[in-house]
Amino acid sequence: MAVSDHHCGGGGRSWRFAVACGVLSRCVKAEAAAAANGRHRHHPTMLLMPGADVEPDVREEAAAAAQLKIMYGGRMLVFDDFFPAGGAVVELVRAAARAGQDVRRAGAARRRVGDSRGLDAGLPVVRKVSLQRFVEKRRRMRVYHILYTDKSSHHVPGPGRYRSWQCRIIIAAVAGAGGFVVACGVLSRCVKAEAAAAAANGRRHHHHHHTTMLLMPGADVEPDVREEAAAAAQLKIMYGGRMLVFDDFFPAGGAVVELVRAAARAGRDDDGARARRRPAGGEEGVAAAVRGEEKSQAARGDGAVHTRHSPPMLPARTPGSGRTDDAAFY
């Protein structure tokens, strides 16, 4: 019995050992297969700044108010407490660009008209010369007609007939070869007619009208030369430590005034938006705050403005003005 029990007990141990070896072999194979598949898995990297990619639940504070400066032609207009909410600065820059483009188109059109006139400048000269010849010939015929008519009549013409006798003398003198003799005859008859009229009216003293000599001859004559257009200057818009520069900005067409009005209008819109965003009591205040936040987010969706860093700020010439009338700028 003891031997049999010993053999039976030994057989049970050997069977258990074989089962344990089989289980161990399967576990080793499974771990090897898992290790081979694990090489192609993505291992997440540890963030150096945990929480950096998480959106904050706290609302960002509104941008602080800053000065808006518009400089053009050596003058500067300053708006204090100008808020950028609602895309006001973007709208201001767009107005400046639109005004500059309109003025450039008008200048190009004027230059094209001037070039077309310059091409035809030599054509009217021939017409002018022919017209002068025709008028001169007409004057000669008229002078001869008047002189011959007066000679045929045997009465002395009245003074009203020779009110422009100076012009007739000049025309007769230029009329031809015998113009000097004709001019002397016309002058003699004009003098006699004036003397007869003075004797008839009883005037002994002739009051002549003395013309005053101008101190600056030609000052009252309109110049024929066109005035040159206003020179182009730089338009600078500074806000929040940055500056936007428009080169070759012409002031024609009230572009600068329109720009200032746009800035003032944008400032008023921002003031109204801030007034609407003020906290109120009850459910109405919460609803108003929600509507104001939605409008501000929709306004921030406009395109960004390309700016460049500006040099140190210049001292404002008219601080705290904020006026929008034309006299404040000009």
Swiss-Prot record:
Matching Pfam families: Jas_motif (PF09425)
Domain of life of the source: Eukaryota
Keyword list, A-Z: Jasmonic acid signaling pathway, Nucleus, Repeat, Transcription, Transcription regulation, Ubl conjugation
Maturation and modification: Ubiquitinated. Targeted for degradation by the SCF(COI1) E3 ubiquitin ligase-proteasome pathway during jasmonate signaling.
Residue window of motif Nuclear localization signal: 126-133
Gene Ontology process terms (BP): regulation of defense response; regulation of jasmonic acid mediated signaling pathway; response to wounding
Cellular compartment(s): Nucleus
Region (Disordered): 267-330
Principal place of residence: nucleus
Disulfide bonds: none
Domain Tify positions: 61-97, 228-264
Positions of short motif Jas: 124-142
Gene Ontology CC terms, in alphabetical order: nucleus
Family: Belongs to the TIFY/JAZ family.
Function: Repressor of jasmonate responses.
Protein name, as recorded: Protein TIFY 11f
Species this protein is from: Oryza sativa subsp. japonica
